[in-house]
Each structure stands twice: as structure tokens, then as C-alpha cells.
């Protein structure tokens, strides 16, 4: 690469080194394309550095502390002390190891790595600004470009993130002490995961949510299981309230919310975590220079090959819209790289799993019963309660269920919903089933190891056929 006015070229340019971007870059290089990856921060993106990995590390650590306190029924007695600074240091070590791993994978694949912020000059050129003022820039021409710039936490008007009083999820994951009182605005998956973490670590947690329940978009019986467990942890929920304003106090902050009747409620807390969703990051790309439009949510529209309105420009991951999931971004990155290399490729949305790492976990894939009906199917349902699974009881778990949705006529698997221990691991079998066109008999006819949680998947499929043995 030459710094200055000279333009150098690459066949495949990837902007953003998160899950979608680094996978696209590695696959492009493996397919023989001269590939360049531009990243302005840390390799691995939000997922690895400020999202999926660090949050799950803290979830695991908080589970250890909580489980130790709850082990008396198993004849184990302990009173663990929490060192949040030490926990954060351990979490950061995990992140550093994986970030270095991603960089190493890219280098080993032959990907050219460039640090900086890329913006489009035209539909065949970007300018990359390196670091801060005086660090210089360079121009890169490309045959194909893949935009994978990810997303960032959305702020509530008047509640801009300051890292001290008003926290984003990124800020919350970097805390070195447990807040005595934590107010969480938003009861979606991020708000619920982090509320659970800090409640288990000893914080007094209050959640306010505009809607009438936790986890908007999930079925009521799933949300109920998670909300009930959260309330057992001491989390206080207040629904139908919107954050309105806040002020600093001697003890921390005072937040006012307002409901639809204009009733104002005040909450005192040490810190306020705002978790109301995420928005695509496109403002650094100078999309106006190539007249590439985004929709009203800032999403770059794409086709089933992840191509934008420009044949040479692709978009993958969060900038390409919901669901904003790392594994969806990776799959799209694969598709875009193959399409750029001239290989046949298309992205299929029907079997994208999703997981929420609450207590208990939630995992879903494919259609719900109502979605199947709306799609014209006559669905049949099979459900297995967690409390009827022997292995679940041996790990002191009893709440939740495994549910499968199938077509009543042909018994093709259409979807699944799990709430319970290790749901995020169990869902893979059912995602594979949907992907390969499996029928209920394929799941029910497969011998599952005993005693394991996976037997609940087997039993749910059998229940849908009227052949359940271990549940009524």
C-alpha cells in the first residue's frame, strides 16, 4: 500500500473486521481473490470486543457466583465474594486472545490488513484515513466491496451515553465495580441479559420498559418464564413507562419516566444502563458519494446475494438489517465473498437461530405456530417441559420447555422454541433439521444420549406425533 495520492488496487475490499467482515475477507482470499480488509478499531468487531464474547464471559462468571449461593439444596455451602475488577480483567483476557486469533487467521489466509476508516469516493474507490490527525490517508480501488461496518447502541433522547452516569452496553461491560443500584431502560435481550448479570453480582436492579412485558417479539409463555426467574433474582420491572429526563444527585442519578397517562415516576440509582436497541453504522462511509441509499432505519437494502443497488458493492451483517446476529453476519459474509468470486451463492433466511443468554436461556429457529399459520401451514405442536427431563433436574433446573412446530400434513419441521438450560446449544439440532428438510420422524427416530438435555428435543418431536413417552 502507498500512503498519499497514489491509488493502489485490490480485487475484494472488505470494510469492517467484525464477524461478517473477517469471514468474508478470509473466504474471499481462500477463493483466490486479492483481498484487503479495512478496520478502524479492533478485529472481531462489536461481537468479540464489546458484545457477544465479553457479555457471555460475565454471564458465566455471574452464574458461578449465583450457583454457589444457591447450592445449599445440593448439600454444598458457600458464600462467594465478587471482585468485579478481577472479573473484568479475566473477561478482557478472553477478548484479547480471540481478537489476536482473528487477526492471525486473516494474515494466515493472505488477507491484506489496513487500519483506518474507509469512505467511498466513487463506486470503485475508497479513501482510507489512518488514525488521528496527521496520520495520512490512502486510496484503494476495488473490483468488489463488502460493507460490514456493524451497528452501535441506540441512545434515548436526553440520555446520551457518557460512560459514567448513562451507560451503553459497551460501558456496562467495562465496569470495574458492581453498582449498588442500577436502573435499566429497556427489557429487550440486551437489557435482560445485563440485568440478570448485575442482579446475580449483588446489584439492586430496576427495569423500565415502554411495552407491557419483557423481550418484545418473543411468545408470551417464553417471556413469562424468563420474567418470573428475573423477579426471583430481585429484579423490579415497571412496564408502560418511557425514560423522560435525568439529573445528577449526591448518590448518583435521579431518572424520571412518564407513562401514557403522563404520570411521572422517579427512580434513584447509581447508574443507568440504556438498552433500547442498536442502529447500523453507515455515517462514516460517505454513501452519498455513490448515491447508495439506506432505508428509514439506516439499513442498506440488499438482495439474496447481499448485493446493494450497485452490483460491485455488497453489504452484510447489521448494516444489512435484522436480525442483528453475528452468525447471520458470518453466513452473509460467506455468501457475499462467493458471489464476488463468481460462484453461485444465495442467502436463506428460513433457518437462522437466535439465542438470548438470560436465566434460563432462550433459543429459537424457524417459525412459531402463529407464523406457520400465517404462511398457510396447518401446524402441529409438540412440547416437552424441562421439569420432565432427568438431566435438567440433576443440574438443579426445572423451568422451561422445548417446543417444535411442524406441518401437520407432511410433518416437515418448521420451527422450534426452547427456554431452559443450554437452550443455545440445543437449538442447533433443530436448525439443521429445518435446513435439511427433516420430518418429525427424523428427530423422534434418532437415538439421543441418556441422560442429556437433548432428550427433550427428541421427546418434543415424539409429542408432536402423539408418541411421547415421558410427558403427557
From Swiss-Prot:
Q: Which Pfam families match?
A: Pyr_redox_2, Pyr_redox_dim
Reaction catalysed by this chain? N(6)-[(R)-dihydrolipoyl]-L-lysyl-[protein] + NAD(+) = N(6)-[(R)-lipoyl]-L-lysyl-[protein] + NADH + H(+)
Q: Which GO terms describe its biological process?
A: 2-oxoglutarate metabolic process
What is its cofactor?
FAD
Q: Which Gene3D superfamilies match?
A: 3.30.390.30, FAD/NAD(P)-binding domain
According to its record, what are the GO cellular component terms? Answer: cytoplasm
At which positions is FAD bound? 39-47, 56, 118, 318, 326
Compartment list = Cytoplasm
Looking up NCBIfam families in the UniProt record yields: lipoamide_DH
Against PANTHER family, the record matches this protein to: DIHYDROLIPOYL DEHYDROGENASE, DISULFIDE OXIDOREDUCTASE
Subunit and partners: Homodimer.
Q: What is this protein called?
A: Dihydrolipoyl dehydrogenase 2
- What gene codes for this chain? lpdA2
Amino acid at each position: 500500500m502507498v500512503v498519499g495520492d497514489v491509488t493502489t488496487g485490490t480485487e475484494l475490499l472488505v470494510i469492517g473486521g467484525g464477524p461478517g467482515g473477517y469471514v468474508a475477507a478470509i473466504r474471499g482470499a481462500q477463493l483466490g481473490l486479492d483481498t484487503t480488509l479495512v478496520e478502524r478499531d479492533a478485529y472481531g468487531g462489536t461481537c468479540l470486543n464489546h458484545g457477544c464474547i465479553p457479555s457471555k464471559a460475565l454471564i458465566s462468571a455471574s452464574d458461578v457466583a449465583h450457583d454457589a449461593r444457591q447450592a445449599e439444596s445440593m448439600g454444598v455451602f458457600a458464600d462467594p465474594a465478587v471482585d468485579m475488577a478481577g472479573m473484568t480483567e479475566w473477561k478482557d483476557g478472553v477478548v484479547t486472545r480471540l481478537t489476536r486469533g482473528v487477526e492471525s487467521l486473516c494474515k494466515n489466509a493472505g488477507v491484506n490488513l489496513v487500519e483506518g476508516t474507509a469512505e467511498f469516493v466513487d463506486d470503485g474507490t475508497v479513501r482510507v484515513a489512518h488514525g488521528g490527525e496527521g496520520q495520512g490517508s490512502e486510496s484503494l480501488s476495488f473490483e468488489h466491496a463488502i460493507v460490514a461496518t456493524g451497528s452501535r447502541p441506540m441512545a434515548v433522547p436526553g440520555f446520551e451515553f457518557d460512560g459514567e452516569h448513562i451507560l451503553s452496553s459497551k460501558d456496562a461491560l467495562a465496569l470495574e465495580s458492581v453498582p449498588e443500584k442500577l436502573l435499566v431502560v429497556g427489557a429487550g435481550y440486551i437489557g435482560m441479559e445485563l440485568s440478570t448479570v448485575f442482579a446475580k453480582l449483588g446489584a439492586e436492579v430496576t427495569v423500565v420498559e415502554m411495552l407491557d412485558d419483557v423481550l418484545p417479539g418473543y411468545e408470551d409463555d417464553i417471556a413469562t418464564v424468563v420474567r418470573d426467574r428475573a423477579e426471583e433474582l430481585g429484579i423490579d420491572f415497571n412496564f408502560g413507562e418511557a425514560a423522560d429526563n435525568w439529573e445528577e444527585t449526591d448518590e448518583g442519578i435521579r431518572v424520571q419516566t412518564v407513562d401514557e397517562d403522563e404520570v411521572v415516576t422517579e427512580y434513584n440509582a447509581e447508574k443507568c444502563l440504556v438498552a433500547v436497541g442498536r442502529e447500523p453504522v453507515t455515517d462514516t462511509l460517505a454513501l452519498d458519494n455513490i448515491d447508495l441509499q439506506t432505508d428509514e432505519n439506516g439499513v442498506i437494502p440488499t438482495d439474496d446475494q447481499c448485493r446493494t443497488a450497485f452490483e460491485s458493492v455488497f453489504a452484510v451483517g447489521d448494516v444489512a438489517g435484522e436480525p442483528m446476529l453475528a452468525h447471520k453476519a458470518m453466513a452473509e459474509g460467506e455468501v457475499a465473498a462467493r458471489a464476488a468470486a463468481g460462484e453461485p451463492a444465495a442467502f436463506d433466511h428460513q433457518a437462522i437461530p437466535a439465542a438470548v443468554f438470560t436465566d434460563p436461556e432462550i433459543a429459537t429457529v424457524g417459525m412459531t405456530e402463529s407464523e406457520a399459520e400465517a404462511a398457510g401451514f396447518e401446524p402441529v405442536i409438540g412440547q416437552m417441559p424441562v421439569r420432565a427431563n432427568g438431566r435438567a433436574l440433576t443440574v438443579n433446573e426445572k423451568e422451561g420447555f422445548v417446543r417444535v412446530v411442524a406441518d401437520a400434513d407432511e410433518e416437515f419441521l418448521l420451527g422450534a422454541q426452547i427456554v431452559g438450560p443450554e437452550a443455545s446449544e440445543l437449538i442447533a439440532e433443530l436448525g439443521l433439521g429445518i435446513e435439511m428438510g427433516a420430518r418429525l420422524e427424523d428427530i423422534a427416530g434418532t437415538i439421543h444420549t441418556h441422560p442429556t438435555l437433548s432428550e427433550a428435543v427428541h421427546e418434543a418431536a415424539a409429542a408432536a406425533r402423539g408418541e411421547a413417552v415421558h410427558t403427557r
